[in-house]
């Protein structure tokens, strides 16, 4: 509906250009918003006020001219001017009912699909030296929800799990594994539960033993040179680490697979060429023995230029080098239209610099969009980064296990007679969903306080509330036998039917915001509002006890569409639904 009004306004702008009211080369930014007060219609635009200067007319006069020039539309019941020049659109109830009717049998719920693009999404990307911790949660689940929405809207999505599987720390890890093998024989292997212990022990040896540190650096050189022995150990370590990651992904219900792993090591052979190409373009400068690039736009508070370090004085490469190689690969090989990076906001300057450099060096096509979709931190109730009571990093598996235990207690307290198998399954879904939804429902760029008590509440904008709301809607159909709605028509008569219908019709524009801005919290807010709209509708409009079959079937269709929208919306967030709670 919103896109339809935008289209009408675009046609009006073109007419104004032809009439000479606006310059022929003028490009208008058309904004259409939902009204908060229904007495002001369903949709509104401030276009007249935006055009008043260039058109040389006062806003209300221009608003009337826009209304007079608008193409006729069956969707629009009436158009009014409000205040200094706002234009309010009242949508025709029968047109809204027709739109909802079309959604009933459509797998995309009546959403008009955009022109498909190839979108590379870089998310999760843990270092393979340690177990995944809570710091990996946000990138993993925010990225995954946006990926799901992109695919649902018909885009070709290429997931890229840019794991940290290369670099100097691997020499340290390989050297320590070599020592363990020497002591315990070839049968010695690293258990998943020992990853953290192993890493700390290797780091301790590296810091305390000069001989060990020398061997670690030697192994890095041998690894980078393709030494078969080093590569064998390196692959084994990565396999163990990746197995752990994918156990966490499976538990989280995240769609990443082994095939999506394209880590730093994948670009190792390209790094030397990156340096050569930057040098050939005259972009490299030597600074304290390192090879760097200075860009005029990036300076510190003192006005001094900030470098992008491409190669260290000892010949080693940095994140910027592999990021540039990855961008070139994603442009030239993957042919991406957009590349989305779900990485901590604290890396904002890094991405601004490498995005700018990639375009400057022509490593990527000019029309390829590079987007850093950063996020804030997850904090404890003291407002500081989330830690264990002893001050250590919280492992992601431990967090999810505690969520499961707490959810089991909650579900058991509400269903004391339920069998253990069913309780366990419901608790699994509720626990994981609560953790994911609590994160996804917050604005991506904000820090937030992690609270089990809040996220497991059945009140407010939480996963348990929405899971219950879905079971309540779906439960209506369990009380009906022999239902045939194939000939049923949606009719919007009661005000609460219209409110629910209007909310259902917004699903497409909400998903477009999710994929355009990388903002799953917008979808969370929408689903919460949809559940509320259905609750108001259900209280005011009897469904199974409606006055007649036509009204009953219409309300059943609205209920069915609500259930499908809630389920699809939750699934796009990576959240399973339940048939009972």
From Swiss-Prot:
<dbReference type="InterPro" id="IPR008909">
    <property type="entry name" value="DALR_anticod-bd"/>
</dbReference>
<dbReference type="GO" id="GO:0006420">
    <property type="term" value="P:arginyl-tRNA aminoacylation"/>
</dbReference>
<keyword id="KW-0030">Aminoacyl-tRNA synthetase</keyword>
<keyword id="KW-0648">Protein biosynthesis</keyword>
<dbReference type="Pfam" id="PF00750">
    <property type="entry name" value="tRNA-synt_1d"/>
</dbReference>
<dbReference type="InterPro" id="IPR001412">
    <property type="entry name" value="aa-tRNA-synth_I_CS"/>
</dbReference>
<protein>
    <recommendedName>
        <fullName>Arginine--tRNA ligase</fullName>
        <ecNumber>6.1.1.19</ecNumber>
    </recommendedName>
</protein>
<keyword id="KW-0436">Ligase</keyword>
<keyword id="KW-0963">Cytoplasm</keyword>
<dbReference type="GO" id="GO:0004814">
    <property type="term" value="F:arginine-tRNA ligase activity"/>
</dbReference>
<feature type="short sequence motif" description="'HIGH' region">
    <location>
        <begin position="126"/>
        <end position="136"/>
    </location>
</feature>
<comment type="similarity">
    <text>Belongs to the class-I aminoacyl-tRNA synthetase family.</text>
</comment>
<dbReference type="InterPro" id="IPR009080">
    <property type="entry name" value="tRNAsynth_Ia_anticodon-bd"/>
</dbReference>
<dbReference type="InterPro" id="IPR001278">
    <property type="entry name" value="Arg-tRNA-ligase"/>
</dbReference>
<dbReference type="InterPro" id="IPR014729">
    <property type="entry name" value="Rossmann-like_a/b/a_fold"/>
</dbReference>
<dbReference type="InterPro" id="IPR005148">
    <property type="entry name" value="Arg-tRNA-synth_N"/>
</dbReference>
<dbReference type="Pfam" id="PF03485">
    <property type="entry name" value="Arg_tRNA_synt_N"/>
</dbReference>
<comment type="subunit">
    <text>Monomer.</text>
</comment>
<dbReference type="GO" id="GO:0005737">
    <property type="term" value="C:cytoplasm"/>
</dbReference>
<dbReference type="Pfam" id="PF05746">
    <property type="entry name" value="DALR_1"/>
</dbReference>
<keyword id="KW-0067">ATP-binding</keyword>
<dbReference type="GO" id="GO:0005524">
    <property type="term" value="F:ATP binding"/>
</dbReference>
<keyword id="KW-0547">Nucleotide-binding</keyword>
<dbReference type="InterPro" id="IPR036695">
    <property type="entry name" value="Arg-tRNA-synth_N_sf"/>
</dbReference>
<dbReference type="InterPro" id="IPR035684">
    <property type="entry name" value="ArgRS_core"/>
</dbReference>
């Amino acid at each position: 509906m919103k896109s339809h009004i935008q289209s009408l306004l675009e046609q009006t702008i073109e007419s104004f250009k032809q009439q000479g009211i606006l310059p022929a080369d003028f490009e208008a930014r058309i904004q259409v918003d939902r009204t908060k007060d229904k007495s002001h219609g369903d949709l509104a635009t401030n276009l007249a006020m935006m055009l008043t200067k260039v058109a040389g007319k006062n806003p209300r006069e221009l608003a009337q001219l826009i209304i007079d020039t608008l193409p006729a539309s069956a969707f629009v019941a009436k158009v009014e001017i409000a205040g200094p020049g706002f234009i309010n659109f009242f949508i025709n109830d029968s047109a809204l009912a027709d739109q909802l009717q079309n959604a009933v049998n459509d797998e995309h719920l009546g959403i008009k699909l955009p022109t498909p693009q190839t979108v590379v999404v870089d998310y999760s990307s843990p270092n393979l030296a340690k177990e995944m911790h809570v710091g990996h949660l946000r990138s993993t689940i925010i990225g995954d929800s946006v990926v799901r929405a992109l695919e649902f809207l018909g885009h070709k999505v290429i997931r890229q799990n840019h794991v940290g599987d290369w670099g100097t720390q691997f020499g340290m890890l390989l050297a320590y594994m070599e020592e363990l093998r020497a002591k315990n024989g070839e049968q010695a292997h690293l258990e998943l539960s020992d990853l953290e212990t192993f890493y700390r022990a290797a780091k301790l040896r590296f810091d305390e033993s000069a001989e060990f540190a020398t061997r670690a650096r030697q192994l890095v050189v041998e690894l980078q040179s393709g030494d078969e022995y080093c590569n064998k150990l390196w692959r084994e370590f990565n396999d163990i680490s990746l197995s752990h990651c994918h156990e966490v992904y499976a538990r989280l219900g995240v769609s990443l697979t082994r095939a999506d792993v394209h880590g730093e090591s994948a670009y190792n052979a390209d790094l030397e060429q990156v340096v050569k190409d930057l040098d050939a373009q005259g972009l490299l400068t030597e600074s304290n023995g390192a090879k760097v690039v200075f860009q005029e736009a990036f300076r510190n508070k003192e006005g001094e230029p900030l470098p992008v370090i491409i190669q260290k004085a000892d010949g080693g490469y940095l994140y910027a080098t592999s990021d540039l190689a990855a961008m070139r690969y994603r442009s030239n090989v993957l042919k991406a239209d957009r590349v989305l990076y779900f990485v901590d906001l604290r890396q904002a300057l890094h991405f601004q610099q490498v995005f700018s450099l990639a375009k400057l060096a022509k490593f990527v096509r000019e029309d390829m969009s590079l987007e850093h979709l950063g996020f804030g931190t997850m904090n404890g109730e003291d407002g500081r980064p989330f830690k264990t009571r002893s001050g250590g990093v919280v492992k992601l598996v431990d967090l999810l296990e505690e969520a499961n235990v707490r959810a089991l207690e909650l579900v058991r307290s509400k269903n004391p007679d339920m069998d253990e198998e069913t309780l366990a399954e419901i608790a699994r879904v509720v626990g994981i969903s609560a953790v994911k939804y609590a994160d996804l429902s917050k604005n991506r760029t904000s820090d937030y306080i992690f609270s089990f008590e809040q996220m497991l509440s059945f009140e407010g904008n939480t996963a348990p509330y929405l899971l219950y709301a879905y079971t309540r809607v779906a439960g209506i159909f369990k009380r009906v036998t022999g239902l045939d709605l194939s000939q049923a028509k949606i009719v919007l008569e009661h005000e609460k039917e219209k409110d629910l219908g209007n909310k259902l019709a917004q699903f497409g524009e909400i998903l477009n915001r999710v994929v355009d801005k990388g903002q799953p919290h917008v979808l969370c807010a929408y689903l919460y509002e949809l559940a509320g709209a259905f609750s108001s509708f259900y209280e005011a409009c009897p469904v199974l006890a409606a006055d007649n079959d036509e009204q009953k079937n219409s309300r059943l269709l609205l209920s069915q569409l609500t259930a499908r929208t809630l389920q699809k919306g939750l699934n796009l967030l990576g959240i399973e639904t339940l048939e009972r709670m």
